[in-house]
Amino acid sequence: MNKLFETKQLTVLSRLQTSAKNLSGLLAVVAVLCTVSCSDTDQPGPQLNIDTTLGQAVFAAPGDAANAFALALRNGDSEMLSKVLGANYREVLPLDAVDGEDINNFNKAWEKSNDLLPQGEHKVLITIGEGDWTLPIPISEGESGWYFDVEEGRERMRIRRIGRNELAAMQAVLAYYDGQMEYAQADRNGNGMLEYAQKFISSPGERDGLFWEVGDSDKPSPLGPLMGNLSPGGGYHGYFYRILKAQGENARGGAYSYMLGDKMRVGFALIAWPEEYGESGVMSFMVSHAGIVYEQNLGPDGVEITEEIPSYNPGEGWLAAKEVSGPTIN
């Protein structure tokens, strides 16, 4: 795997940093959207009726469940939260990862708009704010009353995480495309040639990668400011990335190398795959200088499969991603 990551991972995608950070911040605190009640939390909290089979409180109506949840959060009452959501509530409600400013921001959003969104006859979701953000933990109706379905909430959070990471990955490969197109517009290393970068991060004092250090008044490198906490062998938003230096027979124009001597001048490509299949992502992605993002579900063996992919070759199973696309080259 060390060879696989010789070019390091794409952890310097600054043009995605702000949007991806906001996305991850929203999802990190989406579980604490209800820091005020679904009605008047100044009223005394409801008496909790514990269902011994579920191991948590059940309620006569979904609004009562929401009120109890909100009251517990507002008071920082971990004991009440453990009754409302169950003893393992921290698995879906990571309070230690949320600061007071985040909670205040969501309090304001809640005050602007909040509702219970029906999901059929026996389930509702709490929505908040003008954008109708939803708490991923549904309130479901069981035999003894309404309760927070933490098990389903955990699965909903997993799906959200995958969706968020896959969107970031698609944006990342397009950021790579944009960066390479910009990089090749000038002679970056003084050798008199226009070429594409063969790695993400430049060698110290050089401009042989898509990122290099710049001064305050200098134009940013193609991938912009360096993201913090670089980790060798690490991924970016749940995905690994590798630069490809050739293409196969299924690519537009047929099979050929992107290299002329030791310079990558003919084209470029990139492949991205999940760090942990089914948890950080499902789909793998590829892009080349043609500007089309392809995707495929490589399954649980995706890491091993990508290790064996020597070139950009979107053949059987690879489909053009509909969510994003770059300018195409005819």
Language model region names:
Residues 124-167, 171-174, 292-296:
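Short beta-strand edge/turn micro-motifs at domain boundaries
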Residues 269-316, 329:
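C-terminal soluble interaction/assembly domains
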Residues 33-37:
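C-terminal motif of bacterial Sec signal peptides marking the signal peptidase cleavage site
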Residues 183-279:
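Flexible, glycine-rich surface segments
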Residues 42-71, 153-178, 182:
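Short, low-complexity N-terminal intrinsically disordered segments enriched in polar/charged residues
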Residues 77-88, 194-197:
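Short, well-ordered alpha-helical segments enriched in acidic and aromatic residues
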Residues 89-135, 230-237, 242-250, 255-264:
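Surface-exposed, charged secondary-structure patches
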Residues 1-20:
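N-terminal secretory signal peptides that target proteins for export/translocation
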